């Protein structure tokens, strides 16, 4: 038993381990998206950079949760990371729509985690999840929604290429 553990329920600890897996899974999916757009037959460097950045952000979220788990006296239990459901996308629009769906799943998981903390009256736990994660999730969902709206507006082909260059700042490597 950890010396620093206080009011940290086993259900909160298990929930953090589950969320670590969710964040690593999201990182894995975003990395798959990034390297799809980096392929020579897709060549949308802005999408590549955007999704690579999202992958790193999700990985950092997992690391922050692992640090928190240790700080509260919990134990990190890593689980297998599921393979992404797909390996390629027909367009940037479809990838952004999948990214929005993923962010909503992560957000739902975080909200369920807060509910666990509330059930066990762990205010520190709830504050941590609310302050470090939920606001960022809402911002990500808004950004992706805006991107989807604009990708629908500009269409495939030249519109998608222009979005890649102008909005995502894709440049030739």
UniProtKB/Swiss-Prot annotation:
- Could you tell me the keywords of this UniProt record? Iron, Iron storage, Metal-binding, Oxidoreductase
Which EC class does it fall in? Answer: oxidoreductase
Oligomer and partners: Oligomer of 24 subunits. The functional molecule forms a roughly spherical shell with a diameter of 12 nm and contains a central cavity into which the insoluble mineral iron core is deposited.
What EC identifiers does the entry list? 1.16.3.1
Q: From the UniProt record, which GO molecular function terms apply?
A: ferric iron binding; ferrous iron binding; ferroxidase activity
State the source organism's domain of life.
Eukaryota
- InterPro entries recorded: Ferritin (IPR001519), Ferritin-like (IPR012347), Ferritin-like_diiron (IPR009040), Ferritin-like_SF (IPR009078), Ferritin_CS (IPR014034), Ferritin_DPS_dom (IPR008331)
Q: Which Gene3D superfamilies match?
A: 1.20.1260.10
Give binding positions for Fe cation 1.
Answer: 23, 58, 61
Q: Which reaction does it catalyse?
A: 4 Fe(2+) + O2 + 4 H(+) = 4 Fe(3+) + 2 H2O
Which named protein is this?
Answer: Ferritin-1 heavy chain
What is the stated purpose of this protein? Stores iron in a soluble, non-toxic, readily available form. Important for iron homeostasis. Has ferroxidase activity. Iron is taken up in the ferrous form and deposited as ferric hydroxides after oxidation.
């Amino acid at each position: 038993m950890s010396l620093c553990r206080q009011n940290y329920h086993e259900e909160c600890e298990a929930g953090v381990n589950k969320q670590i897996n969710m964040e690593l899974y999201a990182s894995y999916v975003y990395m798959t998206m990034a390297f799809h757009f980096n392929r020579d037959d897709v060549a949308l460097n802005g999408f590549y950079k955007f999704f690579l950045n999202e992958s790193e952000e999700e990985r950092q979220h997992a690391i922050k949760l692992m640090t928190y788990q240790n700080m509260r006296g919990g134990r990190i239990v890593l689980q297998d990371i599921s393979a992404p459901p797909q390996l390629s996308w027909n367009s940037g629009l479809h990838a952004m729509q999948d990214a929005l769906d993923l962010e909503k799943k992560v957000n739902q998981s975080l909200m369920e985690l807060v509910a666990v903390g509330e059930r066990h009256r762990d205010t520190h736990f709830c504050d941590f999840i609310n302050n470090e994660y939920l606001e960022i999730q809402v911002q990500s969902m808004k950004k992706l929604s805006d991107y989807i709206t604009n990708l629908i507006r500009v269409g495939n082909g030249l519109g998608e290429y222009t979005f890649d260059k102008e909005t995502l700042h894709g440049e030739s490597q």
